[in-house]
Structure formats: structure tokens, C-alpha cells
């Protein structure tokens, strides 16, 4: 009788872990259920809080990871209290891992929902998701925080359809003495021009990324997704703002919303508060319109897991029969899965969020047709063998003009043919590439081939420079750890 009373009272909602819970071992407070995937700096697991029965997400981060980034992520989540931002409940140290306990969003990320359903989103669905996302950005920007990695993979949905901002691994805080940041952080295809150019940026950098995300939700991928990320970062600040591949397929309101987000001048770009008043967002429908696509995505995921389960069970039976033929008493172990549902530990297409993945997901999706059936190569989502990597400090000096020209001029001496002594070999100002029209195909190919080794050389120099700054910090952290151990 006593057990029933403990197990069945009305359970309160978990808001924050109390001091008593935080002093216990995490296994005493949570039951870890399964691995969901990879987030920034760590693996993410689904778990249940024993006292309340509430499902949570736990990010387990190796202590040897970048400690400053982990502390930054925790700090930003601790300060946030919004229904449109993933909640933080508390953290633990366990062996060599830091456990960060946060809100669980059962439907996963928007990008995963697109992949699971093999469909892009409708305007109504996009408007509803953008409305919640803008409320989250309005809150963050009011708190003088920049997310810096807005994309469909970092917008999570709970099972009711509410969108929440997640993955603060690269988020930054604006202070009164630092009104604009000058570091290049984010995912290249979503990055604002001013971020790439390192001319300083503020909260509206997130708005550019939101505009790219709107295109991503409509077309299945961001602009420039099919070209090398390092080439994309040249094109984003140089080219006009991107738009839809087929603008005629989209309403004037949606097209104008994206246009307001993708203004190259940050001073003229709309804020989150202003965009919440845009007709496209104001006419957004309730979250109930997202329930069908959420249920459909979750059904696909469940069927895939059941199929995997049947395959594992079948393999177990076949191996068991073989083992019985080998020996009447000894049964060999069949890996470490033992007939359980396999959950992937890898991410696809750089989603970098606390979401569930199947190993077989990319191979089973086939080709995603986007917008129209008569569109050929442009209308399909191509599978990539490599994942989109988040931008790293290797971009930090990539766009400094003098350094570029020095590298180009020195490299040009070894370039064969007409490129060798050509005055056209310098990077043109203001994106003036008209002179290329007079070149032969052979000359253009030589120029293209010359770019890659030059890029690799610059990246290596920047990497070494970054490492020389990073190493003293790592040494200082290690020294402090040793002193703490001595005490």
C-alpha cells in the first residue's frame, strides 16, 4: 500500500533539480533510456526523472572537451526562462563526464522531421514554426544574447508542436562594452555576411540565419548547400541576397518575409520584434497544424525501429542456431546489442542537436523531391557523404584583404600559363568578375585548380595561429586541475 502511495500521487512538473538531487549520483535521480544522437560537444541521451516521471534529455560531455564552451552553454541556458527556449534543469560531474540535464523535445528537430517524412514543409507549417522561433529570438536578443547557429537542425519541436531554440554551444553574450562581436562562429551556409567579413555583428546576425532557415524548410536545404563550404563563404558576402529557386511557387508574404531577413546591411535588417508583426507571421496558424507532420514523422521512425528490431532478432536467431550446432552448451556472444533497438550515435547533415537518428535513415530516404515533380536535378535533395561542419576559427582572417592579396601574388608566381603574370589574378573588389568572361575555358580551369591549394595553405597558417593561442589556455586549465588534485 505504501508503494502505491509513493508511485501514484499527482506528479509535479520538473522545473529545476533541487539541492538534494544534485548531491546524489545521477543514476539515483535518472534512468537513462536510450541514446538520441550528438549535440555540440557531447552525446545526448533520453532519460526519465524518477521522482516526477518526466522525460528529460541529458547531454554527456567529456571533461577533456573545450571546457570554456561547455561553461558558456550552461551559463546561457541557466539564464534563460522562456517557453521558446530549451530549459536547463541542472548538471552533474560523473567520472570523466559532465551531465547536463535539459528539456526533452520528443518530435526532434525540424530538419529531422523533413528527412523522416521525405517532404519539405508548407507555408502554413513554416509560418507556425517561424512564429515560435522568432519569439525565442526576441527573448534571447532582449537578454542581449546571440544564438549564432540558427538553422532547422537547432529548432526542436515537442510533441504538441511548440518550437524551441536549442544547442547553445556557440551562443554569445553581448555586454555594454562589447556591442559587436568579431568572431566567426556558426554554420557556413547560414552565416550572415557581416559575420564572415568580421566587421562586427550583433543580434540581427541571427535574423539572416533565420531567413536562410526559412528557405531550408521550404526547399529542403539552404542556398549554396551543394558547393564547398569554403567557396560559400566567399559567395555569401559578395553575391546578392539569396532567394527561392522558384519564387513563383511561394506567396508574396512569404517571399517578402525572407527578403526582410536577408538584407545584407545589418543596420537595415529587421529585428525579431519587427518580424513578429510581419503579415506572414501574424497570420500563422496554431501549433495544432503541426501535429499531423509530427505524428507522421514519429510513425516513420517507429516503423524503422521495429524493422531494425526484427532484423536484429532474426540475426540473433540465426546466430543462435549456428551456436547450437557448434556446441551443445556454450553460446557465443553476438555483439553488444543483444536484440535491442539500435540507436545511432552519429548525426546526419550537421544537425548538431539533441535528436534521434537511425543508422539507416539516409540510405532509406531515397531522393527528396522538392516543390515540383517536373524539376530535375535542382528539385532534388542530394545525399552528401560528408556532414556539414560548423565554422571554426580557421575563417578568422580569411577575408582580410591585404593578407589575401599577398598570398595570391606569391602563389601566382608558380601558376602555369597565362595566369602566371596576369594582373587579373588578384581577388576583384566588390565582386566584379566581368573580366572572367574573356578567359578561355582552359584559363578558367587553371584558376579554379589554383584556388584549392592556396586555400589549404591559408587554412593551415590560420590553424597554427589559432593553436598557438589555444595551447596556453589548455596548459593553464591543466595546471589548475593538478593543483586541485594536490589539495
From Swiss-Prot:
Listed Basic and acidic residues bias regions: 303-312
Name residues in a coiled coil. 290-310
| Residue positions where Phosphotyrosine is found in the record | 433
Q: Where is this region: Disordered?
A: 303-332
Name its GO BP terms in alphabetical order. apoptotic process; hippo signaling; protein tetramerization
- Please summarize the record's notes on activators and inhibitors of this protein: Inhibited by the C-terminal non-catalytic region. Activated by caspase-cleavage. Full activation also requires homodimerization and autophosphorylation of Thr-183. Activated by RASSF1 which acts by preventing its dephosphorylation.
Q: Which sequence positions carry the modification called Phosphoserine? A: 265, 320, 410, 414
The top EC class is transferase
Domain Protein kinase, by residue range, is 30-281
Residues recorded as binding ATP, renumbered to this chain, are 36-44, 59
| UniProt key word Metal-binding | yes
SMART domains according to UniProt:
S_TKc (SM00220)
Task: Name the chain's protein.
Answer: Serine/threonine-protein kinase 4
This protein's encoding gene: STK4
